[in-house]
Structure formats: structure tokens, C-alpha cells
Amino acid sequence: MCGIVGYIGNKKAIPVLINGLSKLEYRGYDSAGVAVNEDGKLNVIKCKGRLSFLEERLKAEKLDGCMGIGHTRWATHGEPNDVNSHPHISQSGEIAVVHNGIIENYIQLKEFLIGQGYNFKSDTDTEVIAHLVEYYYEGDLVDAVMKVIDEIEGSYALGVLCKDEEDMFVCARKDSPLIVGLGDGENFIASDIPAILEYTRDIYILEDKEVAVLTRDSVKVFNSLGAPVNKEVFKVNWDVEAAEKGGFEHFMMKEMYEEPKVIRDTINPRVKNGELVLDSINITKEDIAKLEKIYIVACGTAYHAGVVGKYIIEKLCRIPVEVDVASEFRYRDPLINDKNLTIIISQSGETLDTLFALREAKKSGSRILSIVNVVGSSIARDSDDVLYTWAGPEIAVASTKAYNTQLTALYLVALDLGLKKGTISKEEANNILASLKEIPNGIEQILKNKEDIQKFAHNHYNAKSIFFIGRSLDYALSLEGSLKLKEISYIHSEAYAGGELKHGTIALIEKGTLVVCPMTQDALFEKMVSNIREVKARGAVVLAITQEKNKTELEKTADMVLTIPDVDSLTAPISAVTPLQLFAYYMALEKGCDVDKPRNLAKSVTVE
């Protein structure tokens, strides 16, 4: 969840580190710091707060060193303050460490180090690593780091400087992402590609327990036993501009405007001669015939995509589907075997709870199909089959375009499995595919008409509590709409199945309560109209979202009707979520919230 950047080369390190950290702000953080090795001295500057605060402190320093590490911290051990910020230095000032992850046995290690005479200044688990590297360091930094990673338990991405090693530094990872960027006379490390994309497109993706040694002219990688590893160079195929705002006020709005393109990019390469072809999924008819159940496992927004996936896969494939929150799945001893398929969904491909859930399912014999957005990510590498969502980099913490492409990918998976199982015909599949291809045009129309949503938000942004209700696929939409609103506007919100209102929720409805009702399912339209009448009778204000064809009828009961272009009920969630995203965006904007970087949240959750 933190951001790590490291540099060694011929440039001054500080500008490279600050630039890289600024590209990782989307990951969420509460403090920042850098360490530079200059003439055999480690200079560490760090502070609580935004990166701009760190830049102010650096103006008073003259740090010209050409090797350094930087970090943005999101607190897991110890409150956000200057002392707990990274980098952490060892007792003698010989070692500096940045760390992302959680060291589970840090208390035992801390007690050992205290017994050896080490004093601790912070409340973090990371300080243990700095002291432990110093404890083992006898002139060989690589050997010391190897010994440390053999002792620590938990997850980590590490960058380690030593004042005596002026021409090299070391990094390592386990269960937390870290990449190495390869330059000409310079090399880099980073938590994510945007931090170093300005300098190189060639990277190494480190595997668990691999250690990399960086000099200006070389990168050597070793496994946990110290044996050299020949790494394959991965070439990044997207541009720096893809991770910039491009004239928009916020990344979130830019990314909503990118939804039509990324949906097309996710569909079009997989349609050949008018038929769906998923080359990356090698599940045969025989494999499908053996399937007794499908699990979908994810967190947050990706979980809500999975709820839609359950409806679609069960309808098109007639296979039971269970949707699980990843953090619950791995601890509840799920009944998994080789007759199951587990679909893993993650934008980053590094979500730690989801990664561990994947490994739990795989250990029990399940086949793993992942839907991820980052090529070469940990989840992708651990999967049997991968379907990439070509959403490009998503910088805003609140997911928008990645969610739309996750939905799109789930529809493609359902079509592929249904065709192979014989539960849908080619004609039915082609009709659904044609409907999916129309979705981008519909979203473009929604974005053109966004002013209606903006006006409604202006009139209702002071709402204290907002309820979302829907049925079937619209209930899944309600879950996501409610989460988006909570994430970025900090307004309390809950989502309920429409049929559950009378079972308790309606007690919360009073005069002026705002209720949002996605209504895209033709078969359930009248049921939802009844729900609207129920809440209206108790004084609620109702915002409804439906196809254009229903507008006139719905205006008789709802206070405000937002429309999406007419689309089949089955595929409607992909376009109907865009008005919900816009609603959350404008509510947050009216309240003066930081839309792209909401409080307490991180983009990529790489700790449990």
C-alpha cells in the first residue's frame, strides 16, 4: 500500500525519487521520506503529510548524491508521524531501509535485538529490519539481506542502502510488489510502473524471495538460496501520458471518459470473424463438463463485479456460482476440489488477500482463472488461465474504468463457458456480443449528458445518509454505487436488495431520505416501481436510473430520472454503473473532498 522508489545512476537522486513518489501518490499515504548515500554518509529526510511537505524540507538541504531510496507510507504499525515515517536507519546510521508489507514476527525479533543492545525509536515493524541488517552486516550487504529475509515472517518489499556501499544497493520482495527498471548507466526500483516509466520501459518483475543487487551498470538477481537467476525483460507497452490527467481536473473523471475505449479494447481483440475467441483461456468442453461449482473471489469493487458475474455465469452456463470476499474465503476452510473453477478478480493483480485466497484454492486442487489489469502481476503468474482487462493505468483510488472492464471480461468468460458447455447457442452468444459492443456508444452518450447528474448532486450533497436499492443485477449495481459514494464523498450509504426493504430497512426511511434506484431489469421493473412507492410514502426523495424507454413511465413516481441509452437488461450493468460513478464524483466535488485521493484509502492493498 506504500510506495517505494530507488535510484542509482549519474543523475542527482532526489529529483528522480520525488518524481517517482509523485507518480505513486494514488496508492495512498500519510507520510513520505528519502535516504541518499552521499560520500559514504546516509542522509535521511522524512516527515508526516503530503509529498509537498517533504519537498519543502528538502529545499533546506543540499543533497547531491546519485543513489537513494524513497518511500510514501500508509500506516499499519504506529501512528502517522515523522518518527514512524520511512526510511528507517539502523542504530549506528550504517543502514537505511524502506519497506512495504507487514512483518508478523517483528515483536520476537525486536526483543532479540533489544537483548543485543539495540534501541528503538519508532513504533514500526520496519525498524526491526534496519537493525537486523546491521546486526548481520560484515562487509557483505547481500549476505546480510539474505540472512534477514530468512528470519522475517510476513510480507515485504525492501530497499536497503548501506553507507559503506557507495556503488550499489539491494532490494528484495515477498508477497508485496516490487519491480526493477533497467536503464543506460542507471537502474531503478519501484512499487509500480508509473514511478519509473519516464525513464525506462524495460523492467524485471521480481518473484517471491528474490534479491536484486543494483549498480549503475548492472542488475543481478538471486534466489533465496543465493543462486543467480536469469530474468526475462518485460517491456511496458503503454505511454507516460496514460498515467497523466490529460487536461481533466481529476483522474477519476478522465478515467470515466476512458471507459468506452477500454471496453472496446477488452472486447475487440477477442472477436475474430464475428465470433468470440479467448485464446488465453484453455478450458475445454471436457473440463467444463466436470465442473460442479465456480467460485468468484475478490475484494471491494472487484467483488461487486463478481456479484454481477455470478448472475451472468449462472444464467448462461447453468453452473452454481459462489461469490466470496477474499479476506473471508481463505480463513473459512472452503469446500474446494478439482471439480471447481475459481475466478480471481483484481485490478492490480497484487491485492494480497486475493492472492492468498488464490493460493488457498489452488492448494485444494481448483483451477484458477484470473481477471487482472496488470500483465505479469503476482495473481496473473500464479493462475492457470488469465484474461487481461485492457484498462490501462488507473490512478484514481476509486475504481471506475477497471470495474467496467472487469464486468466486460466476466461476460466474455460466461459466453465462452456457455458456448463450450452448450447451454447457449452461437446465435444467442452473438446477440449478447453485439449488445456488449454497443455499450461504449451508450457510455459516450451518458457522459455527454452528465450535467443532469451534476445539478442533482448540487441540490443533495448535504444528505447525511443515502440508500441504494435494486433487484437482481441492479442490486449488484447498488452495491457498487453505494461503495463509490462512501469512498469519495464520505457520506454514509448502504445498499439493499429491493425485496428486503420490508424486512427492516424501511424503518430507516424518513422525510428527505435520499434513495437511489438502478432499474434496468425489464422483468423486475414493476416490482421496483412498488419499492419506490413504498419509500415515497415515507417521505423519501428518489433518484432512478433506467433505460430511455422507461423514462416517461418512471417520471410519474421518481423525483429524478437519469437515463441510459436503451440496452438489453442482461448487459445493462456495464453502462448503468457510469451514472452512479458520476453521481459519487459530483457529490464529492460539491463537498470539497479530494476525489482522487480519499482519506484513509489506498489504491493497491498489498497488506492483509
Predicted segments — roles?
Residues 49, 70-83, 272-285, 309-345, ...:
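Glycine-rich oxoanion-binding loops at beta->alpha junctions
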Residues 226, 541, 567-608:
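Generic C-terminus detector
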Residues 289-431, 435-438, 520-560, 583, ...:
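Glycine-rich phosphate-binding loops that contact phosphosugars or nucleotide phosphates
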